[in-house]
Structure formats: C-alpha cells, structure tokens
C-alpha cells in the first residue's frame, strides 16, 4: 500500500514514523539530505487538556506520553529528520520545559538541534498561533509547523516539494477521520470532523470549518463559486496539524492578535483572503506580501501577490492523525504496535505459565507472573503484573502495579497507578498514581484522585 497518491514507500518501513532503523544518517532505504535554509521547523508541545487524566500537574507533559513505548515527541521529530531538517524550534509551556529538556539530553535518539522555547505568556488557554506569535522573532524563512501529537506516515519531502512547485501562501495536511478498531463509550463522544472544501484540479483549499461550528446549514459566496465552480466538500476529514507557510504569514500573525489558533482562526482567515477582495483590502494584506522581509527564496523576487491556500489529503488507511484525545491516543498506540514486530518484549521477566500475545509490546523491567494472559496490549517500563491477571486491548504506562486476579479490558492506565486485586475494569481511564481499591468493578469510568483534582483547580 502506498503512503499517499504520489509515493510508494511501504508503511512498515517508513522511517518517518518509526525513527532510526540503522545508525548514522541513513534511515532504512532513505539517505537523508539537509533541508536548505529556505525552511524552518516549529513543533508545538501544548498542555493536552483532551488527554486528561493522562496529563495533569503530577503527570508527564503531553509531549512525553508514550505511544508504542516511545515518547510522543519522538515521532514528529523523526518525521522532520526524515525530511532532512537539522534543527527545529520546540514551543512548550514553562512547567514542561525541564521534563522535555531532560528527555532531549538523555532519551532523544535523533541528530537534530532542538531549540526549546517556553514563553511565559503561554498557558492552557493559548493556542498554536499564539505560540507562533511568541517566537516570531526566531522565524526568518518559510516554515513548517506540526504538533507533538502528529503521527504521520507521509514522506515529508513530498509536502515540501509540493509547496515549492505550487508556491502557495500555505499548505495544510488533512486525512480521513481515524477509524477506531474498537468503539468505546469515550470514542463515541469524539467528533473531530471538519467541513473541507477543495478544488480537486488545483488542490486549492476553499472552505475550512469545524462541523460543530457550521450546524445544519452553511453558505458559499457566489464570488467563490464563480471563480471555482467545481468544489468538493469533504465531511470525513480532520487536520493532521501539519502546515507549511510563507514567511509573510508570521508577520500577519504577529500583528493580528485576534488570530489565536492555526486551525480555527488562521486557516479560515487565509481561505477568506483568496476570494474576498474587499476583505483583503480592508485588512491591508498587501503590505505583508510586499514587505522587504518577504523576499521569495526561489527567484529572488517578492512573494507571490496571489494568496493561495492548498490542501494535501492523505489516502485512507495511512497513519496520518493526531493523538490529541484519548480515543485517538488509544488507537494510534495500537497502530504503531502493529508496525514494530521486532522488540516486542524488551528485557522483561515473563513466567513460563503466562501468555503474552504476539500482538503485544512490553517494555524493560516489567514482570508478568503465573497464569496471566496479555493480549493486544502495550505495557510500559517497570510494571508488575500479578498472578491470574487478564489484560486485553489496553495501554499500561510505566511503574504500574496490577495485583492478582485483575481483569482489564480496553483501559488506559497512567503511570504509577495501582490496580487492587480482583478488580474488573472495562473501558476505564485510570489517572496518574491512582489507587483502585480491591474488587472494584467499573465500566466507562474515569478513575482519578479527587484530592489532586482540587489541587490542580487551586
């Protein structure tokens, strides 16, 4: 299966997802080359409100939550390195800075120089464009933005080459909404769909709004339809939170403080500029395009005077999604596990009378005792799985104790939790360091320490 329409890299060998396969600068079958100075890379490492209770005051930062027993941040950094980037700006909140820097020093296996920025103005009420505004002084060229939760199998060089050839003001990557292998009560509540209007012949992005913002009725301006009469409206797409921008866009963001989110504010703003001349005149967009700072990198002239926003859509069945909510996080863990058949059990102690399925990943220092059965699950470091335990279709992070006779089905268990003996939990989310009492029976519940919630609120 090809990764997308014009590429033929097999997904299982894609270095853009799995990271280094061999030493040096050679990743699998791709010899990496450095990206010219024309592009800079920016990675967002936000708070992760939608991943609660895995995130919180005592938890790992969102960027370091494990996916396939590797920190989430591992994947976008290797995606960039696969494109040949040699450096990146990483924007995080102040409370996450020390954790991320520690991992970059001791756990990061790549070769890029990562410049960590933790602007004091950022908090969990700010969004991606706010973060860009805070580091705008560091952005000198056209730039690539992606989130720390973007898990992408598309060879990145394709999107960059498409940007070079089409020369748009912005390029946004979309993918079919992630399909859940196992529907839970939590996944039913997630609606990440957007209404995306694209002119297929030119890949022009002409409409971009969340389905929740539109309701049952929506309108197209006649000026748009006269200029672009063949628009395909997609209702099954979500953004992968990967964007490529011309440099002048950072000047726009710096001035327009009302633009807070790339997805919710900036992209709709730029889309509107494409076909509403009166709007571009009123907003005086021309001054950004003709600024001396925005010299075209390719021909030495001014940036294109036409505002053009393009879309790149990943084919269905390709990993190109965000781990930005619990159902997606759950599903992407399983997707990554399927792509790493090697090193399923790394320095673990497994009883001869225990069963660990071939579809499981178990990390170092973990012990699995007699008569336990682990299937379709990922277990992190230094966990203790007691006797007669059944774990199926679940994710257990690091330093977890599961006592004898426990049944876990379709659960996510955060680091440091302890599950009391003979508990039966299904479709539950267990918070950091939470102690589940023995014999607890629950389905579809969020089990957290209420005292910690009150502390966080204070």
Swiss-Prot record:
SUPFAM superfamilies (UniProt xref): Nucleotide-diphospho-sugar transferases
Gene Ontology terms describing biological process: cytoplasmic translational initiation
Entry protein name: Translation initiation factor eIF2B subunit gamma
Gene that encodes the chain: tif223
InterPro entries: eIF2B_gamma (IPR051960), NTP_transferase_dom (IPR005835), Nucleotide-diphossugar_trans (IPR029044)
Organism per entry: Schizosaccharomyces pombe (strain 972 / ATCC 24843)
Family stated for the protein in its record: Belongs to the eIF-2B gamma/epsilon subunits family.
A GO molecular-function annotation: guanyl-nucleotide exchange factor activity
Localization of this protein: Cytoplasm, Cytosol
Keyword flag Transmembrane helix: no
Sequence positions bearing Phosphoserine: 291
Function text: Acts as a component of the translation initiation factor 2B (eIF2B) complex, which catalyzes the exchange of GDP for GTP on the eukaryotic initiation factor 2 (eIF2) complex gamma subunit. Its guanine nucleotide exchange factor activity is repressed when bound to eIF2 complex phosphorylated on the alpha subunit, thereby limiting the amount of methionyl-initiator methionine tRNA available to the ribosome and consequently global translation is repressed.
């Amino acid at each position: 299966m090809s990764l997308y329409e014009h590429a033929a890299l097999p997904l299982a060998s894609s270095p853009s997802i799995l990271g280094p396969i061999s030493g040096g600068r050679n990743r699998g079958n791709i010899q990496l080359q450095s990206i010219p100075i024309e592009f800079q890379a920016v990675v967002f490492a936000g708070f992760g409100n939608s991943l609660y209770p895995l995130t919180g005051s005592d938890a790992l930062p969102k960027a370091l939550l494990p996916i396939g027993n590797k920190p989430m941040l591992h994947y976008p950094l290797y995606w960039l390195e696969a494109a040949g980037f040699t450096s990146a700006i990483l924007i995080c909140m102040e409370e996450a800075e020390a954790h991320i820097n520690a991992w970059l020093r001791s756990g990061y296996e790549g070769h890029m120089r990562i410049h960590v920025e933790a602007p004091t103005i950022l908090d969990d009420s700010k969004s991606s464009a706010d973060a860009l505004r805070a580091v705008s002084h560091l952005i000198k060229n056209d730039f690539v933005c992606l989130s720390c939760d973007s898990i992408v199998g598309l060879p990145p060089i394709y999107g960059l080459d498409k940007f070079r050839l089409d020369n748009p003001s912005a390029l946004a990557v979309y993918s079919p909404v992630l399909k859940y292998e196992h529907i839970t009560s939590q996944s039913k509540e997630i609606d990440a769909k957007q209404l995306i209007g694209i002119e297929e012949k030119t890949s022009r992005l002409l409409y971009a709004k969340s389905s929740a913002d539109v309701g049952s009725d929506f309108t197209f301006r006649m000026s748009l339809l006269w200029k672009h009469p063949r628009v395909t409206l997609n209702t099954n797409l979500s953004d992968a939170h990967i964007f490529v921008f011309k440099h002048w866009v950072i000047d726009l963001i710096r001035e327009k403080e009302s633009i807070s989110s790339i997805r919710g504010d900036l992209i709709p703003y730029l889309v509107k500029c494409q076909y509403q001349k009166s709007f571009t005149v009123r907003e005086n967009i021309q001054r950004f395009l003709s600024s001396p700072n925005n010299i075209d990198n390719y021909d030495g002239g001014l940036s294109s005077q036409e505002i053009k926003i393009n879309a790149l859509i990943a084919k269905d069945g390709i990993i190109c999604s965000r781990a930005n909510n619990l159902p997606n996080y759950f599903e992407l863990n399983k997707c990554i596990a399927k792509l790493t058949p090697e090193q399923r059990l790394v320095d673990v102690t497994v009883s001869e009378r225990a069963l660990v399925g071939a579809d499981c990943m178990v990390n170092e220092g973990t012990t699995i005792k007699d008569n336990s059965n682990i299937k379709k699950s990922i277990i992190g470091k230094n966990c203790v799985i007691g006797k007669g335990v059944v774990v199926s279709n679940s994710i257990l992070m690091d330093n977890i104790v599961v006592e004898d006779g426990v049944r876990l089905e379709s659960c996510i268990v955060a680091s440091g939790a302890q599950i009391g003996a003979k508990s039966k939990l299904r479709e539950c989310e267990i918070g950091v360091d939470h102690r589940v009492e023995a014999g607890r029976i629950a389905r579809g519940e969020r089990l957290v320490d209420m005292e910690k919630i009150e502390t966080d609120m204070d």
